C-alpha cells in the first residue's frame, strides 16, 4: 500500500467535521425504542457470565456513560439470557457526532419489523421481545406504560408452537384397530396400547380425540351427501312425472282405438 495513505493530511481529512454533521435535538417525550437483540450485560458495561444472566432479574440502575448510552440516562432493566424488558428514562442532551464526544439521545427510533404504537406519551423506553414467562413474577409492572403492558400481554398470551408427533405404520395400525373396536377407550386400555406401541398415554389420548373428530366429519359429510342425493332423486322424479303421464295417456288412447 502507498505510504501517502497514512499521511497526516489523509487521516485528518477522513474525520468528519462537527459543523457539517450537527443533528437536530430530539424531543423529550420520545416514542418507544425497539432493539432487535441485546446480548450479555452491555447496557451496564459489565462482563457477561452466569451471574449476569440471572442477576438481571432484579432492577438495577444504569451506569452513567454505559456502552453507547448518554450520561443523562436513568432507569432499570430486566433480563433473562438474551431477552430483556425494561425502561430507560432519557433526558434531552446536546447532540453531535462521535468526534465531539456527544452521543445522540434515544429518539423515535424503531425496528422495521415492529410497528410503532400510536398515541404514545411518556419517557423513552426500551422494549425487546419476546419476554419469557419466568421473568413475569420479577417485573415491576407499576412502572410500565399502558402501551407496554398491552405488548407484554400479547407476548405472554402467545401460544407456544406444538410439535406434531409422527406415528409409524405399526402404531397407526394398532391405533386404528382399537378405534374400530371402541371409539372411547378407557385409561387402562389406552395405557396398555401405549406400552404395546411404545407411546405415551397422553399421545394415545390425543390421537383418539383427533380420530373421533375426523370420524364425525366424515359421518356428517356422508349424511349430507345422502340427503343431497335423495333431494336430487325427488326433483328428477317430479320433473319426469308429466312426461310419464302424457305417455300413459297416449297409450290409453291407442288401446281404445
From Swiss-Prot:
One cellular component (GO) term of this entry: nucleus
Alphabetical list of CDD domains matching this protein: homeodomain (cd00086)
DNA-binding region: 160-219
Entry keyword set: Developmental protein, DNA-binding, Homeobox, Nucleus
One of the protein's GO biological processes: neural crest cell fate specification
Signal peptide: none
GO molecular function annotations of the record: DNA-binding transcription factor activity, RNA polymerase II-specific; RNA polymerase II cis-regulatory region sequence-specific DNA binding
Region annotation (Disordered) ranges: 213-257
Chain intervals with Basic and acidic residues compositional bias: 241-257
Subcellular location: Nucleus
InterPro entries on file: Goosecoid-like_HB (IPR051440), HD (IPR001356), Homeobox_CS (IPR017970), Homeodomain-like_sf (IPR009057)
Family: Belongs to the paired homeobox family. Bicoid subfamily.
Physiological role: Regulates chordin (CHRD). May play a role in spatial programing within discrete embryonic fields or lineage compartments during organogenesis. In concert with NKX3-2, plays a role in defining the structural components of the middle ear; required for the development of the entire tympanic ring. Probably involved in the regulatory networks that define neural crest cell fate specification and determine mesoderm cell lineages in mammals.
PANTHER family: HOMEOBOX PROTEIN GOOSECOID, HOMEOBOX PROTEIN GOOSECOID-RELATED
Protein name in UniProt: Homeobox protein goosecoid
Organism: Pongo pygmaeus (Bornean orangutan)
Gene: GSC
Amino acid at each position: 500500500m502507498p505510504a501517502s495513505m497514512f499521511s497526516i493530511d489523509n487521516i485528518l481529512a477522513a474525520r468528519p467535521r462537527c459543523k457539517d454533521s450537527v443533528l437536530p435535538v430530539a424531543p423529550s417525550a420520545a416514542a418507544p425504542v425497539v432493539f432487535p437483540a441485546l446480548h450479555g450485560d452491555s447496557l451496564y458495561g459489565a462482563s457477561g457470565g452466569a451471574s449476569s444472566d440471572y442477576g438481571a432479574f432484579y432492577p438495577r440502575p444504569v451506569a452513567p456513560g454505559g456502552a453507547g448510552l448518554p450520561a443523562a440516562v436513568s432507569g432499570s432493566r430486566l433480563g433473562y439470557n438474551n431477552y430483556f424488558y425494561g425502561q430507560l428514562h432519557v433526558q434531552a442532551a446536546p447532540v453531535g457526532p462521535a468526534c465531539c464526544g456527544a452521543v445522540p439521545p434515544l429518539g423515535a427510533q424503531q425496528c422495521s419489523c415492529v410497528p410503532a404504537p400510536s398515541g404514545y406519551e411518556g419517557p423513552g423506553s426500551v422494549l425487546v421481545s419476546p419476554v419469557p414467562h419466568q421473568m413475569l413474577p420479577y417485573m415491576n409492572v407499576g412502572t410500565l406504560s399502558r402501551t407496554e403492558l398491552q405488548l407484554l400481554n400479547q407476548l405472554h398470551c402467545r401460544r407456544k408452537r406444538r410439535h406434531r408427533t409422527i406415528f409409524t405404520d405399526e402404531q397407526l395400525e394398532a391405533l386404528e384397530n382399537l378405534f374400530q373396536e371402541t371409539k372411547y377407550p378407557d385409561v387402562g386400555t389406552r395405557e396398555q396400547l401405549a406400552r404395546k406401541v411404545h407411546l405415551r398415554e397422553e399421545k394415545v389420548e390425543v390421537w383418539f380425540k383427533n380420530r373421533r373428530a375426523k370420524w364425525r366429519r366424515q359421518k356428517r359429510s356422508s349424511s349430507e351427501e345422502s340427503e343431497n342425493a335423495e333431494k336430487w332423486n325427488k326433483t328428477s322424479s317430479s320433473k319426469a312425472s308429466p312426461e310419464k303421464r302424457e305417455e300413459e295417456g297416449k297409450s290409453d288412447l291407442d288401446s281404445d282405438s
